[in-house]
């Protein structure tokens, strides 16, 4: 057994072979490497599959034996300081390794076809393999030094992948925004690491936890300073996992290719913050108030992400805000001490969200056959609709992922989310009300996305659409057009003439079509995983002997509430309540977004009935306020732009003016005086060498005389 663990250090290095081989091939055999570029997708999948098989084997060993293995190699610089490098294999490591590899393999298979015609095909697979390697290095790290190194590499890869199409201004701005926002969190993480090293004198996790626990127990450390350092560590997780208030980069990150979005949202970048908090949970548990702070940030993010997703027209941005909200649930669970619930939801959400993003990519791929390559149009749900008959497999996959995310039994997210919801009542009734209420919001906005995309008729021809996109901080109307009023109140109905026909249609010669098998296979496999993965964590109290997750996590459980058993009656009661809330959200989404014109030939009667009702007017005002809030991203981006970006620019202008008018002028004066002096000496000596020598020896003699005189 120990021999197996000794080879675990290769986990992050195996995927790293792909970028190294591609780089060497482009240097030595550039033409052959480019001509055989499709071969590299197979290499990427093969190497990541090796890591997946090894990770699964380690996980089976841990489930059977419940062992934790750590290897540390010390590099002694002097007697007082040494750097330690190594790797840690525990349940958290094995869970994250399996998530990264399984989702990564499916995304790579999908990407082979999705990126087939892109000129940056080789660059894409280089970045993706490096991304997986960096994430695997992060999850196997045994100390803060390695965590920070791989943390920065993950951030670098996200910058490269979000800005993959860097010639597009939107993508270039998005990757910069993500990079700068994460720098705030990374700086906090660095300060927190240095603070805890100053307190404990160690970077290694297990040793640091033990020392800090002893110091706090004996009251030999300032609790205020320890709490501050812990909060700084958590700031790093806030930025990476797009939690409030450092969430602003996440929707703009959708400028990258869709497979990247699937990997980022399922198992890598945003999961890194959850992983960090889970890894440091023994540290946070012994520090007063920090756990409440974690749960508070999480519950704010749960509600904020759900409300901002209510009015998105870009299908990928709607899913991005969904990710933000679901990550908030995981943070709430970690803040409550429900370690198992948080990791369970991390697992189920990863596969469900990967399925949704890959299905969304398939939809975008099919829309490009009609409107050409235009992300502003191909991702806009307003011009979609009626895709069920064109992409039936993709539609089924998206529907299954939607039902899972809504918490509909027996799909994956139902089991994990209900566990978090049940624990929330024991922690805080206020938090519980928000968490349970957001279940309805989640069901509403997810079925809104589904209905706008797949139901009704294809809306490419309607004239009320403009694909023009705004800057992230600008408001955007329902139809994607900039304006003072971002909401069209009668958003369910398009402009029609007296006969009930569309006023303006754009003719198109082709229909959307289903994606190829290499894009459908990962979706079908994820459908199966989404259906069965939740059964791994069914509590034993329900009469099913399937709770593999608890046995898997047994060596590293830090739970607060799972000492209480849950009987079948209580479980069914909570299931009925959460399911009822979810179905209410689905029902409201159907009322608002189910195309009424599918059953009626003319819109005139329907429009008149809706417009003459007083309740309709009041409802429209409420809808307008909600949509205005959502479209303007709760005005948080605007606030940052006005109070941070603009102020920094003004300050930089002041510094620039000071530099030009004061600093530069001072040095220019010295330069001018030197020029005058040199010109004077030149004319004084008539530009002859004997005169220069005379003045030289004259002044040297004076200097020597004064020196010896003193």
Curated annotation (Swiss-Prot):
It catalyses: a plastoquinone + NADH + (n+1) H(+)(in) = a plastoquinol + NAD(+) + n H(+)(out); a plastoquinone + NADPH + (n+1) H(+)(in) = a plastoquinol + NADP(+) + n H(+)(out). Gene3D superfamilies: 1.20.5.2700. It is found in: Plastid, Chloroplast thylakoid membrane. The chain crosses the membrane at residues 9-29, 40-60, 89-109, 125-145, 147-167, 185-205, 221-241, 258-278, 280-300, 327-347, 354-374, 396-416, 425-445, 519-539, 571-591, 657-676, 689-709. It is an enzyme of class 7 (translocase). Pfam families: Proton_antipo_C, Proton_antipo_M, Proton_antipo_N. InterPro entries: NADH_UbQ_OxRdtase_chlpt_su5_C, NADHpl_OxRdtase_5_subgr, ND/Mrp_TM, NU5C-like, Proton_antipo_N. GO terms for biological process: ATP synthesis coupled electron transport; electron transport coupled proton transport. GO terms for molecular function: NADH dehydrogenase (ubiquinone) activity; quinone binding. NDH shuttles electrons from NAD(P)H:plastoquinone, via FMN and iron-sulfur (Fe-S) centers, to quinones in the photosynthetic chain and possibly in a chloroplast respiratory chain. The immediate electron acceptor for the enzyme in this species is believed to be plastoquinone. Couples the redox reaction to proton translocation, and thus conserves the redox energy in a proton gradient. Belongs to the complex I subunit 5 family. NDH is composed of at least 16 different subunits, 5 of which are encoded in the nucleus. PANTHER family: NADH-UBIQUINONE OXIDOREDUCTASE CHAIN 5 (PTHR42829:SF2). This is NAD(P)H-quinone oxidoreductase subunit 5, chloroplastic.
